[in-house]
Amino acid sequence: MDIKAFKMDGLGNDFVIIDQRSQDFNLDKDQIIKICDRSFIGCDQLILIKKNKEIDANVEFFNSDGSISGACGNGTRCVADLLSKESGKKEITLLTTSGSLKSKILGNNLVETEIGIPKVNWQEIPLSKQLDTQDLKIEIIDRNNTKHIGGIAINVGNPHIIFFVDDIEAFDLKNIGPKIENHPLFPEKCNVTLAKVINRNLIKVKVWERGAGLTKACGTAACATAVAANINNLVEKTTDIEFVLGSLTISIDERNSIHMKGPVSDIKNINIKL
């Protein structure tokens, strides 16, 4: 089977995007895993674009382990840019399993997406039992065997836990990430972020992405981190979240809705042979 696809990324968070509006086929879990495997094509997530007569398109997100992801901020921005270049429209609306997302094309490869209102109640994360989502009291241990207890849970289309620490490099996230992702407190697993507040307009982060592992960037993690920092009055309503290859600007408006702005890569056409 020959598949026409696109490769894009947002700050190194990379995607294989397949437009199923013009290609009639289905992919099973094993095929998704193969496409995402970096010994084959390779990506953090695979994205399917599907027809929608009411809005621009439906999108489905799959992690590199073949699992479904309810939301993907950087992926949404990439698809919005792709469809904008196809249609000439400067505003793109996409329907995801987590709801409708609107994006604005700002030029110079910048795209802003409204992610919506975050969820902070324990049932909405969801957690397996009732706890204070602003202090989960989960223990993580740094490279010096020093224990740190905390964790803030936020759902921005998918579940996240954020640990604010003094030094994000003091932790082995490759070791900690899968343990927290699969913690019994999270029945749907979770994304794990280590965050250091630099000032009231900047936070540095490292992310372990649910179903994908260590990633260079994660849009929803940036959103969840900004929300958690705002709740605790650590930053302003607009703040930059810095990853290895650059930053996303996260703003929280008067309705408490999250807006994410950042760059997307150029579009690369690829062919996949399965």
Swiss-Prot record:
Q: Which GO terms describe its biological process?
A: lysine biosynthetic process via diaminopimelate
**Is this entry keyworded Transmembrane?**
no
- EC top class, in one word? isomerase
Protein's pathway: Amino-acid biosynthesis; L-lysine biosynthesis via DAP pathway; DL-2,6-diaminopimelate from LL-2,6-diaminopimelate: step 1/1
Q: Where in the cell is it found?
A: Cytoplasm
Q: Which Gene3D superfamilies match?
A: Diaminopimelate Epimerase, Chain A, domain 1 (3.10.310.10)
What superkingdom heads the lineage?
Bacteria
Main location (coarse class):
cytoplasm
Q: What is this protein called?
A: Diaminopimelate epimerase
